[in-house]
């Protein structure tokens, strides 16, 4: 559920 820029992690 974590978004960094245009990337997503869970």
From Swiss-Prot:
Kindly state which keywords UniProt assigns to this record, in alphabetical order: RNA-binding
Annotated GO molecular function terms are: RNA binding
According to the entry, every stretch annotated as the RRM domain falls at 1-10
Please, which domain of life does this record's source organism belong to?
A: Bacteria
Name of the protein described by the UniProt record: Putative RNA-binding protein RbpA
Task: List the source organism.
Answer: Anabaena sp. (strain L31)
